[in-house]
């Protein structure tokens, strides 16, 4: 499932913009480089978010295939407010286009 979504996103966004790997999930916003570095060092997490873990747990319990698709809105380097405003529309448009393409392929 994740391969299908990755291929669709790659087709929309082009080379070098799609990454597959572990996404950490938790109950806090990761905004500093130190916390970001700790998550990578301990778990090799490529990104962090706050919603996917609970959905993944329920999907796994019910045997439902699941993939997290994330557009990275900030780099966890203290510039989150600026980054979000800059990338919100682009991220939403690109994610929607990739999802439409992936669903057609399923």
Summary of predicted features, one role per range:
Residues 1-106:
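Glycine-rich phosphate- or other oxyanion-binding loops that anchor nucleotides, phosphorylated ligands
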């Amino acid at each position: 499932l994740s391969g299908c979504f990755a291929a669709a996103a790659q087709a929309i966004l082009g080379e070098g913009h799609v990454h597959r790997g572990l996404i950490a999930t938790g109950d806090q916003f990761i905004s500093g480089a130190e916390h970001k570095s700790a998550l990578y060092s301990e778990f090799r997490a490529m990104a962090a978010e706050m919603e996917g873990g609970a959905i993944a747990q329920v999907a796994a319990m019910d045997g439902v295939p699941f993939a997290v698709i994330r557009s990275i809105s900030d780099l966890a380097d203290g510039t989150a407010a600026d980054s979000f405003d800059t990338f919100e529309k682009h991220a939403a448009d690109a994610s929607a286009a990739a999802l439409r393409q992936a669903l057609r392929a399923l």
